[in-house]
Design a protein with these regions (language model features):
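Hydrophobic, aromatic-enriched alpha-helical segments typical of multi-pass transmembrane helices
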Residues: 1-140
Length: 140
């Protein structure tokens, strides 16, 4: 989904805006509406991407809390970033890229980035071992 979002935002929308900028006055209105439609597709994809990312992180957080392989706060951090990311997806769907949507989404995504780095560090340190495995059998 993120790839589709980047394709719409970085390629299709730029093409539409460039076409609008270069068009003669008689064609500008139609191209404006076409560019606006592409922008609405971008908003829809961004909304779904936020919902999906937030849901995934939240479910990982729950799994980390249940599993107990890693510190409890790692699972909590996933949920602290995941839930507002889902909320941002709902806000983006209803208000577009509004100030409110960005005020929710940007800090939540920053938390998820921190969470991913922390979880990666925890997994690296544990070497993939389960707490109930003998040290001699742990993978390095």
């Amino acid at each position: 989904m993120a790839v589709a979002l980047q394709a719409v935002d970085g390629i299709a929308l730029k093409f539409m805006v460039d076409a609008w900028a270069a068009a003669p006055a008689a064609q500008k209105e139609g191209l404006f509406h076409a560019a606006f439609a592409v922008r609405q597709i971008e908003i829809g994809l961004a909304s779904m991407a936020s919902l999906s990312l937030g849901l995934t992180a939240t479910l990982y957080g729950v799994a980390l809390l249940v599993d107990r392989t890693h510190p409890r706060w790692v699972g909590e951090l996933a949920m602290v970033g995941g839930v507002p990311t889902m909320m941002a997806g709902v806000v983006i769907a209803s208000t577009g890229f509004s100030a409110l949507a960005m005020a929710i989404n940007m800090p939540a995504n920053a938390l998820l980035l921190v969470w991913m780095l922390v979880l990666g560090g925890c997994m690296w340190r544990s070497g993939g071992a389960r707490p109930d495995e003998p040290a001699a059998r742990r993978r390095v």
